[in-house]
Amino acid sequence: MDQGRTSANHWHLPATQALRREAHFDSRVVPCFAVRPAGLATMMRQAALHHPHAEALVDGEQRWNWQQLQDASLRVAHGLRHLGVNPGDRVALLMGNRAEFVLALYGIAQLGAVAVPMSTRDSAKGVGFILNQCGARAVIAQADMAGLLPARLDDGTPLVQVLCSHAAGSDAPTTKPSTPWENLLDAVPARALHDETKEAEEAEEAEEAEEAEEAEEAPAIIVYTSGTTGQPKGAVITHFNVVHSTLHYQTCLGLAAGERAVLAVPGSHVTGIIAIVATMGAVAGCVIILREFKAAAFLQLATRERMSYTLMVPAMYALCLREPGFAALDLSAWRLGGFGGAPMPVSTIEQLGQHCPGVRLFNAYGATETTSPATITPPGSLTLDAVGVAVPCADIRIMDDDGREVPPGQSGEVWIGGPMVVPRYWDNPQATALSFCGGYWKSGDIGTLDTDGFLRIHDRKKDMINRGGYKVFSVEVENCLMGHPRVLEAAAVGVPCPVLGERVHVFVHASADGVPGEALAEELKNLCRRDLADYKVPDAISFTASPLPRNANGKLLKRELRERLLSADGAKRSG
């Protein structure tokens, strides 16, 4: 399929951001930004060259400008090389949001190795699976995570371990050989760093176009999809992918030097890496670390550091609005607020507009396989049901079950093509063949495109409910329920029914003002009866005291919710 269609007309690209079609990844022809950096390390070097004294990174009381960040990341690269890590080797990162994550990410890129971020919430089994599946040569981890790390991979290969202090008195002792983070940074004298930086810049200027293109397609990061089913798969994000996604954020949002972005979502997740860390490198902005999201801590940090840009899931915005004193805060520097992973309730949009009128809210739809954004809502077009239009180089098509494109307005599976789509999963040709076709990633989402190019997501293919022969898109039910002021989160799932095939069961996480019970359940059903077809009205509603389960991308884990119902049903039967 020729990936020639783009939505550049929605974005009014400047002349400096012209597009051209190029062949990449085994002759796949895609629209590309004609002028672009070669990769992650090049973006950082350009930021240090043109904005050496601009603030680049803030973590508590620690601050780095771009020259200091480049020096520190070069130390990381030299230290890893001293430990036996070579270009192309995989280096895992097992740590939360902290400065070392950013320094390590750029250091790994400087070395030409491949970063493999992992979640600190994973189990020893999950961590071991990723380390072995990617064939990691080294891991940089918080010291309190050392207990999750094997000394060797399953094939007997030793695993180089670098440990960062977590907090005073909290580091668990380890008997495995490891290198302290501070020793990694001291592996080479400062003079040698500056000499090598100069040599690298001269070599980069002399590099042939063919070599630069080959480097573009080299893996930069492997992000494992937490997935909603099955074993995680390692999406191979190349430098080519990273560069185009950061340019999409920069172009569509009007980002520029001096932006100040709070990293509120996990840095190990594709949104944190691409939308915040890498994009701030592309524009010479500043990454402000929030180690753990608490609404009060986020608002305090955003106010103190004059935050201009962030991305969060809708529930995080709702928690901020509920924080006492929110309306009195000086958030006047905040101008861009992105969200994804779930619909933004109308009440949240309205309250943010009232208290922060200078903030442009935007929906960013994408996935690990699309290196973050595939669509973004243009200015002035935010609606409850649409996730935006394709970013400039993206090609989005709606396909039927036979792989044929359907007309505008007709629902089908969302296929996404473009230079930000990863070429494969790491060492998993079977999963690659199932999920990719002709350069397009098959999202598994059911959606529609209208004649203006706006994409609407109706459901996951596997989450659509068949109630007595009628199709119920769970997202439609959830959006309706989110219109109630007490509903913080809602998830509709299909449960087996001997008569109808499936019935509609909804899980609701409600606000704390009042005890949820039969009265609220009836209110919610009446809301659905008013706004939805009768067969879409929930048959049952369960209230949860804690937030609904989500993966690292903020997407609901409906499999876990179904398992809760099946377990409860099994307990009833056995009782």
Regions picked out by a protein language model, each given a short descriptive name:
Residues E22, G147-E216, D569-G570:
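ANL superfamily adenylate-forming
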Residues R90, G96-V116, T120-A124, F129-A138, ...:
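A short helix-loop-beta submotif of the ANL/AMP-binding
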Residues D122, V139-A141, T310, G418, ...:
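AMP-binding/adenylate-forming catalytic core of the ANL superfamily
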Residues D2-Q17, A34-A56, D71, A571-R573:
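A short N-terminal helical cap/helix-turn-helix that marks the beginning
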Residues V243-R260, S268-S308, E323:
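Conserved AMP-binding/adenylation subdomain of ANL enzymes
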Residues V35-R36, R45, H53-R98, V102-Y106, ...:
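Conserved AMP-binding/adenylate-forming core of the ANL superfamily
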Residues M307-M312, L321-T383, D395:
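Gly/Ser/Thr-rich phosphate-binding loop
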